[in-house]
């Protein structure tokens, strides 16, 4: 399973990867620039947290590694890796319905809270899960 030993990096496909769930002590890296934005990562075995321009973007408990995270106007996609199941919280638009797809299947349609946070769990079990969180279109069946 991949861990990001340098804590955060850019990928050739225009995405970012971050997190190292193997670390026993909390480790941080600040001021990582990507596409004009500044990122800050805090990661270790109990937690992985990513901030973009000093605002919350991603958090998992326990810690995870995330590969190929991309943000679009429709939502976000990434692959989460970890030694056990994880609770993930991401920043979205406030009070908006989102489809949560895990490994290509719609798991849930969920509304982000007033602050825009959306939480869900992923079954990793010493593996990975491909996650897509996309704005739910009105009239679409879940």
Where are these regions (language model features)?
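Catalytic cores of secreted or luminal carbohydrate-active enzymes
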Residues: 2-65
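C-terminal beta-strand-rich structural cap/linker in extracellular carbohydrate-active enzymes
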Residues: 28-51, 60, 86-88, 112-142
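Beta-strand-rich interaction surfaces with strong enrichment in secreted/lumenal proteins
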Residues: 65-68, 75-78, 108-110, 119-123
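Surface-exposed beta-strand/loop patches in extracellular or lumenal glycoproteins
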Residues: 79-96
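Short strand-turn-strand beta-turns centered on an Asx-Gly dipeptide
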Residues: 101-105
